[in-house]
Structures are given as C-alpha cells and as structure tokens.
Amino acid sequence: MQSWDPCLTPLELHGALFLHGPYWTPGLFRLIALGTCGDSCTHVRQPPKTWMGATVFVQPLDLVKNRMQLSGEGAKTREYKTSFHALTSILRAEGLRGIYTGLSAGLLRQATYTTTRLGIYTVLFERLTGADGTPPGFLLKALIGMTAGATGAFVGTPAEVALIRMTADGRLPPDQRRGYKNVFDALIRIVREEGVPTLWRGCIPTMARAVVVNAAQLASYSQSKQFLLDSGYFSDNILCHFCASMISGLVTTAASMPVDIAKTRIQNMRTIDGKPEYKNGLDVLVKVIRYEGFFSLWKGFTPYYARLGPHTVLTFIFLEQMNKAYKRLFLSG
C-alpha cells in the first residue's frame, strides 16, 4: 500500500490511495465526480509547476488583451485595429521577447491566486461535506467557488497590478515608461513611490471578475447543455459537452470582459496632480462607453476567449466523464 502524504487533500487520497484498495466506495467516487464545478471550483490539486507551465503559454494572450483594452483610452486614436494587428505590431516593434513582457508577474499572479483559491476551496469543501462523504449541493458548491475565487483574486491583486503595468509599458513613449525590471522590482517601486494601498488598486473589479467568471460558467453551461439536448440533434455525449462548454466559454468571456477592462484601466492609471484618472470601476465603464463606444467594453475579446475557452472545455468535459463513470459503476443495475 502507498505511503500516506499528509499534504494530500482528501480528494487526492480518494483518487490515488484508495483507487485500488478496499476503501474505494461509491461515496468516495461521487466526491471526486462532483468535486469539480467551473474555473474556481476545481478541487483536484495540481503541482505549482503545472500552473507555471500554463502561464508561459498564455502570457502572450494576456499581453495582447491588456494592450487592446488600453488602446484608444481617453478618446485617443486606437493603436490596434484587431488583436492580430496588436500581436504583429508588438512583434515588429518589440521582438519575440516583447510578447513575454511581464512573465514574472504572470507567474507570481498564478502562484498567489491559484494557491489561495484552491486552498480556500479545499477547506470550505471539506468543512461542508457530510459525515457520510456527501458533497455540498450545486448552489453551495457554486458559492464556495465564488468565495474561493474572490479571496484568491484579492491575494493576487498586487501581482495583477504589476502585470498590467509591465504589459502596458511597451506601448508608451520611452520617457513615460515605468521600466520595471521584474515583478519584485515593480512591487518594491510601487510601495516606495505610491504607497502600499496601490498594490491593491482595482481589487474590487478583480474580485468581481472572479465571481462573474464562476457564475457565468456554471449557469451558461447548464443552460447550453439543456438547450442542445432539447433540440433533438444531440445526445448526452462528449460532443454535446464540448459544444455546451464552448458556448459557456463565449458567454463567460462576454459577461466578464466589461469588469476586466475596468480592472485593467484602474490598475494602469496614473495620478495626475493628485487626481486619479478614474474614480472607480463604474467611472471606467461610463467613460469607455461615452468616449470609445459601447462595444469597446469588449476590446481584446479574441485573446481573452482563446485563454478562457479551452479551460472551460476541459473543465466541463472532465466533470461530465467523471459523473458518467460514477453512474455507470455504481448506479447501473
């Protein structure tokens, strides 16, 4: 029998230690099958190097999205027409290294946000799981996920601020750039030059984005799947799950982008003559609509969806397959 690792969560123990042993029961399997629900509800703990590896791949998407959201700010002429134009312009002006500007901040954000999110989710999930191993209901799991996501977002806000500023630097004239060397240099200088509270600038829209992403993913996937099944063209199989999760990714992207652009603008803003460019997230939304047009709230949609869509697909397909396996193994016959 494998040795017990005290750092493993109960879910990991169920999946690894009990899989081939006498402890493998329907209750434990059901806990695994129902322990995943959306972006911030993923209960299976992954090693930090997995999150870091993913960040390396999505960093260019984050950079392009941030540049698109800042393009045309304050009724200025848009720097980029499309996301592809932004990507090619950055490569041409800043080189291949340019699209990885802010990578150190992205890695720190992933480490702080994901570690906190999964830690909080694990604790709450275990506290609210019944003595017989029955997991919390759907709505309670959704609430746990939103709480964990919002808490993780708060802890990760300083890294978010550094990331936004570092990815935005290349679009500015040399004399206006902040010139942070890395994420730690950014954090130290922000504290020294602007004060500790600036590290949590934009924490409210950052937390709101985490809540919106969770709520939108769960609601849109459930409704999309039901719509596809009711159409008569789909059966409850992996194709249906794939299509429903793709739709969910689109809905989640559309729902969370206005909050995301407010976060980006607030965290990148400067204080001029003691007065910040924006009062709050609502002020950002009002000014974007007034000076740049309503649909400017969705600038950077393509790279944002390219980042969020695949994650949504994998999350729900995994969940569905686990649920099906549970029903097949323990409920059939």
UniProtKB/Swiss-Prot annotation:
Principal cellular location given in the protein's record: membrane
Annotated Gene Ontology cellular component terms: membrane
Pfam families: Mito_carr (PF00153)
UniProt keywords, alphabetically: Antiport, Lipid transport, Membrane, Repeat, Transmembrane, Transmembrane helix, Transport
Transmembrane segments: 30-61, 102-120, 138-159, 202-221, 241-259, 300-319
Protein localization: Membrane
Membrane topology listed for this record: Multi-pass membrane protein
Keyword Repressor listed: no
GO molecular function: antiporter activity; transmembrane transporter activity
Reaction(s) catalysed by this chain's protein: (S)-malate(in) + 2-oxoglutarate(out) = (S)-malate(out) + 2-oxoglutarate(in); malonate(in) + 2-oxoglutarate(out) = malonate(out) + 2-oxoglutarate(in); succinate(in) + 2-oxoglutarate(out) = succinate(out) + 2-oxoglutarate(in); maleate(in) + 2-oxoglutarate(out) = maleate(out) + 2-oxoglutarate(in)
Domain of life, per lineage: Eukaryota
Cysteine pairs bridged by disulfides in the record: none
InterPro entries per record: Mit_carrier, Mito_Metabolite_Transporter, Mitochondrial_sb/sol_carrier, Mt_carrier_dom_sf
Solcar repeats: 29-127, 136-227, 236-325
Gene Ontology annotations of biological process type: lipid transport
Keyword rRNA processing among UniProt keywords: no
Subunit and partners: Interacts with SMIM26.
Family per record: Belongs to the mitochondrial carrier (TC 2.A.29) family.
Function: Catalyzes the transport of 2-oxoglutarate (alpha-oxoglutarate) across the inner mitochondrial membrane in an electroneutral exchange for malate. Can also exchange 2-oxoglutarate for other dicarboxylic acids such as malonate, succinate, maleate and oxaloacetate, although with lower affinity. Contributes to several metabolic processes, including the malate-aspartate shuttle, the oxoglutarate/isocitrate shuttle, in gluconeogenesis from lactate, and in nitrogen metabolism. Maintains mitochondrial fusion and fission events, and the organization and morphology of cristae.
Protein name per the record: Mitochondrial 2-oxoglutarate/malate carrier protein
Gene name, Swiss-Prot/TrEMBL: SLC25A11
